[in-house]
Design a protein with these regions (language model features):
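Active-site acidic/histidine proton-transfer and metal-coordination neighborhood
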Residues: 53-153, 160
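N-terminal pre-domain/capping segments
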Residues: 1-46, 50-71
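Histidine-acidic metal/acid-base catalytic patches
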Residues: 140, 145-155, 159-204
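Short amphipathic alpha-helices and their capping/turn segments at secondary-structure boundaries
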Residues: 2-3, 24-38, 68-75, 135-147, ...
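Active-site beta-loop-alpha junctions enriched in small/polar residues
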Residues: 16-20, 47-51, 87-89, 125-129, ...
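A structural signal for the main folded, soluble domain(s) of proteins
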Residues: 3-5, 38, 99, 111-121, ...
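Hydrophobic faces of well-ordered beta-strands that scaffold small-molecule active sites
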Residues: 13-15, 42-46, 82-84, 122-124, ...
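A general structural motif
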Residues: 10, 37-41, 79, 117-119, ...
Length: 204
């Protein structure tokens, strides 16, 4: 897998744990060795079960545990970044959902530090469905909780969220500039230069 990834000239690999963190630490160590030899850095996508804005507290607490599991794995793989979806708004307002997510984010940062994973970088991701918590502004709000948090900007998701009215062939240059300007304004300094990014081939 490392050789195949390197054959494309890639230097980063995002290990998917959407259905749960199931990779054993022994296998992770073997992957780390193989990918290190090719100069490829790992990140981990945390489980899709995360719901930082849930109305149910146990689901919010479980979300923190999923992030801890993901941090343990990414460290075993020799990486630092953990990407995750914050969750949906459900039957509450966006404002209420964001407040719950911010509270869960604070708990997550504390738990990550207490578990010894303070060097891990949590990366909330922009989302494509309108009812999901994940506009660029919402993601940047989550990043305000701690200076170690950086955004995962999924440009395909932002395009889908706008139903193709943004980041299309006509508007892309101005839209990309606006996104980068917003990140720079919210995260001054080096953090804005190191945001995580996803690109997907989506067309409306």
């Amino acid at each position: 897998m490392a050789e195949y990834t390197a054959s494309f000239g890639l230097t980063a690999f995002e290990y998917q744990c959407g259905r749960g963190v199931r990779l054993g630490l022994d296998k992770a160590a073997a992957l780390k060795e193989a990918f290190d030899a090719k100069g490829i850095t790992f990140s981990v996508h945390a489980p899709y079960y995360i719901s930082m804005s849930s109305l149910e507290e146990d689901k919010r607490l479980n979300s923190v545990n999923y992030l801890l599991q993901s941090c343990a794995l990414v460290k075993a793989l020799g990486g630092r970044r953990v990407i995750f979806h914050a969750g949906s708004c459900g039957k509450q307002s966006r404002e209420a959902a964001l407040e719950k997510a911010l509270d869960t984010m604070r708990r997550a940062v504390q738990a990550v530090d207490e578990a010894g994973y303070g060097d891990c970088i949590l990366c909330p991701e922009t989302m494509g469905k309108v009812n999901q918590l994940g506009t660029l502004d919402e993601v940047l709000a989550l990043c305000s909780v701690d200076e170690r948090i950086i955004p995962c900007v999924d440009f395909g998701h932002l395009y889908a969220r706008s139903q193709g009215t943004e980041l299309n062939d006509e508007t892309a240059p101005a839209d990309y500039a606006a996104i980068l300007d917003a990140i720079a304004a919210a995260l001054p300094g080096e953090r804005a230069k190191k945001f995580h990014a996803h690109f997907s081939r989506i067309a409306y």
